[in-house]
């Protein structure tokens, strides 16, 4: 049964240009050779690659593991420090005065450039402040800041002294913040008086106050960065609240903090998943393996060169911001753009303005942003100079072929490879991806595994699907990789049950995938997003991809609903592009497209014209809510605090009620 991605793939295999291949960090031949070594002789491969990092003490054993019982240990006995690898190692080189962080504020008139030496000095000073407040190795520090340089400085300062940082996205509510405080029990909180997003102020200190009032934990110290300068209505508790700038300007504060020598398996950070499926999980990453994963993938996936300016649009509140805005770039000595704003402010040309302003060479963003900007047309793009770009990236969800083609043609001008990266908070670093000078791309496919990663497809009985040709199944990973999570913080049982119990001997990703005849992987969506229509398994992502092939459609989300005859029917929420009129003609067009690209079995039973879709702030569609609305369960929708725009849900409920009446 063909689907949109397969149809597109048969038409389009996009190979890197001869010029790109000539200058790339790796060739296809070397990729195949190194990948083979990484699977057949992982100890040799990872021992060599670990020398990319600076170790205070070398490891005694590369890898010990009992994967069936979720026990993994990398670089046993090795000692290192993350901030040392991101900063100190560069200070005695010509990189000392190279731009490390290029900060672009929400307001286009605000910007800052911090060199490696600037960041090094700030991190040392703030590390000493943390120590002054009694923070020591193993203590947790909760960070609730906007996208400003102090966010990167804070987490690097934590790594310098061995404290475990837990960054909470600045858009989360006081309730979401409180649940994370209760779970990780921080010694100290770092926040700001407020922030800006899309020209609008966001309250941060106030949210921290509300969270701490309700929290079971008694946090004694809150350090506040002055971002807005608006102190009206700011509650201040002497003895608890301290201004960041006041502390940093203390003339007696030492300018150097000796980096803590950390064991490779010492905890580095806790990052909570979005909470779209019940209680948030505190994903725990450790020091050596995580940093090596972020460092190595950044070098190869983004084909980084010393002169590049690189921009990952993700917030540091998400794992993409951790790995590919801070730790991956800085450990490689790269210049990393950090953006406080949104793509639509002050107008829909903001991304292109930033690329033009800084001469960005490598651009890494999410399909959600790409599709939103597609709706705005080409006018904003044509006014900007994007000629500096040489590589594009996609992250967060599968990119549908139409968005891929638009991105390739209009942003990359047909010359920039696109790395469509599949990975998770839990994996720590990129797992399946094209290497841009080596692996030909297929629009919509994540392509092939990174070094040391063994993705397999298993059936529902846990049997590995080894057939050649086109096959589908549950995406699992066979064997350990350095940057994998080591546990759910404070809940080892949940770690095993969530990731290792369903398919014995494998890490279960929760995603479904298809592997084509060339061995390329196509992510078809979460396994719980599979709709069983008359005994046929239909991936929601497949239907969504077909729907958005229509030039009138901006976005689509598909869920199953109870059907008297078929067991489950297909219900499609469809958002059209600006200026498009919704009518029965368009509805028939969409159904016809799905039938043509997948088959009649996949035709939507209902098309619901949606003004928007309920998404988390990281861009993930909350299908759990959509399923409940379809079923008429308008109450008890669960935690909606992670939604970017809760009003969308109410509108969908009203539409559904009208539809029923």
UniProtKB/Swiss-Prot annotation:
NCBIfam families: Ac_CoA_lig_AcsA, PRK00174.1. GO terms for cellular component: cytosol. InterPro entries: Ac_CoA_lig, ACAS_N, AMP-bd_C, AMP-bd_C_sf, AMP-binding_CS, AMP-dep_synth/lig_dom, ANL_N_sf. Catalyzes the conversion of acetate into acetyl-CoA (AcCoA), an essential intermediate at the junction of anabolic and catabolic pathways. AcsA undergoes a two-step reaction. In the first half reaction, AcsA combines acetate with ATP to form acetyl-adenylate (AcAMP) intermediate. In the second half reaction, it can then transfer the acetyl group from AcAMP to the sulfhydryl group of CoA, forming the product AcCoA. Its cofactor is Mg(2+). It comes from the Bacteria. This is Acetyl-coenzyme A synthetase. The keyword Cytoplasm does not apply. Its EC number is 6.2.1.1. Acetylated. Deacetylation by the SIR2-homolog deacetylase activates the enzyme. GO terms for molecular function: acetate-CoA ligase activity; AMP binding; ATP binding; metal ion binding. It catalyses: acetate + ATP + CoA = acetyl-CoA + AMP + diphosphate. GO terms for biological process: acetyl-CoA biosynthetic process; acetyl-CoA biosynthetic process from acetate. ATP binds at residues 396-398, 420-425, 511, 526, 537. Belongs to the ATP-dependent AMP-binding enzyme family. The modification N6-acetyllysine is found at residue 620. It is an enzyme of class 6 (ligase). The keyword Magnesium applies. Keywords: Acetylation, ATP-binding, Ligase, Magnesium, Metal-binding, Nucleotide-binding.
């Amino acid at each position: 049964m063909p689907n949109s991605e397969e149809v597109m793939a048969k038409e389009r295999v996009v190979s890197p240009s001869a010029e790109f291949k000539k200058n790339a960090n790796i060739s296809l031949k070397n990729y195949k050779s190194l990948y083979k070594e990484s699977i057949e002789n992982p100890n040799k491969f990872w021992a060599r690659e670990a020398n990319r990092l600076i170790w205070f003490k070398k490891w005694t054993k590369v890898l010990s593991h009992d994967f069936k019982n979720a026990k993994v240990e990398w670089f046993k006995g090795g000692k290192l420090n993350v901030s040392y690898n991101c900063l100190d190692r560069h200070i005695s080189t010509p990189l000392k005065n190279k731009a490390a962080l290029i900060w672009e504020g929400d307001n286009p008139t605000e910007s800052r450039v911090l060199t490696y030496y600037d960041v090094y000095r700030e991190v040392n000073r703030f590390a000493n402040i943390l120590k002054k407040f009694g923070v020591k190795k193993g203590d947790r520090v909760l960070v609730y800041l906007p996208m400003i340089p102090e966010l990167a400085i804070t987490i690097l300062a934590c790594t310098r002294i061995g404290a475990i940082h837990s960054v909470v996205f600045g858009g989360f509510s006081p309730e979401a913040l409180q649940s994370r405080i209760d779970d990780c029990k921080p010694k100290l909180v770092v926040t700001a008086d407020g922030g800006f997003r899309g020209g609008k102020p966001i309250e941060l200190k106030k949210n921290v106050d509300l969270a701490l009032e309700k929290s079971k934990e008694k946090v004694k110290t809150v350090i506040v960065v002055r971002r807005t300068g608006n102190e009206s209505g700011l509650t201040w508790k002497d003895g608890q609240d301290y201004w960041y700038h006041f502390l940093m300007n203390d003339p007696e504060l030492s300018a150097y903090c000796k980096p803590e020598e950390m064991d490779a398996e010492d905890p580095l950070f806790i990052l909570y998943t979005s909470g779209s499926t019940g209680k948030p999980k505190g994903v725990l990453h450790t020091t050596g393996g995580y940093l090596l994963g972020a460092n190595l993938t950044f070098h190869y996936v983004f084909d980084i060169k010393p002169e590049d300016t690189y921009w990952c649009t993700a917030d540091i509140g998400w794992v993409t911001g951790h790995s590919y805005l801070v730790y991956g770039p800085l450990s490689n000595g790269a210049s990393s753009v950090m953006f406080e704003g949104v793509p639509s402010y002050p107008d829909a040309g903001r991304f292109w303005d930033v690329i033009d302003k800084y001469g960005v060479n490598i651009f890494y963003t999410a399909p959600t942003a790409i599709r939103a900007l597609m709706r705005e047309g080409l006018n904003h793009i044509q006014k900007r100079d994007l000629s500096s770009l040489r590589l594009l990236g996609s992250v967060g969800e599968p990119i549908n072929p139409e968005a891929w083609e638009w991105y390739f043609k209009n942003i990359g001008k047909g010359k920039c490879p696109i790395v469509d990266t599949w990975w998770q908070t839990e994996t720590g670093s990129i797992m399946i991806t094209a290497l841009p000078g080596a692996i030909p791309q297929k629009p919509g496919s994540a392509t092939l595994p990174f070094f040391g990663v063994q993705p397999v497809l298993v059936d529902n009985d846990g049997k590995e699907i080894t057939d050649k040709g086109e096959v589908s199944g549950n995406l699992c990973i066979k064997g350990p990789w350095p940057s994998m999570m080591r546990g759910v913080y404070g809940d080892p049982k949940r770690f095993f049950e969530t990731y290792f119990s369903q398919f014995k001997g494998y890490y279960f990703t929760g995603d479904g995938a298809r592997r084509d005849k060339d061995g390329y992987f196509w992510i078809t969506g979460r396994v719980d997003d599979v709709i069983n229509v008359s005994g046929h398994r239909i991936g929601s992502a497949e239907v969504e991809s077909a729907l958005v092939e229509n030039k009138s459609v901006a976005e689509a989300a598909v869920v199953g609903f109870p059907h008297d005859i078929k067991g489950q029917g297909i219900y499609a929420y469809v958002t059209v592009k600006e200026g498009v009129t919704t009518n029965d003609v368009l509805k028939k067009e969409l159904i016809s497209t799905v039938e043509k690209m997948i088959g009649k079995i996949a035709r939507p039973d209902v098309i619901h014209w949606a003004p928007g879709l309920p998404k988390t702030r990281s861009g993930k569609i909350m299908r759990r809510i959509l399923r409940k609305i379809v079923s008429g369960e308008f109450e008890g929708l669960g935690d909606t605090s992670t939604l970017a725009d809760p009003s969308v849900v109410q509108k969908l409920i009203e539409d559904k009620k009208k539809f029923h009446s």
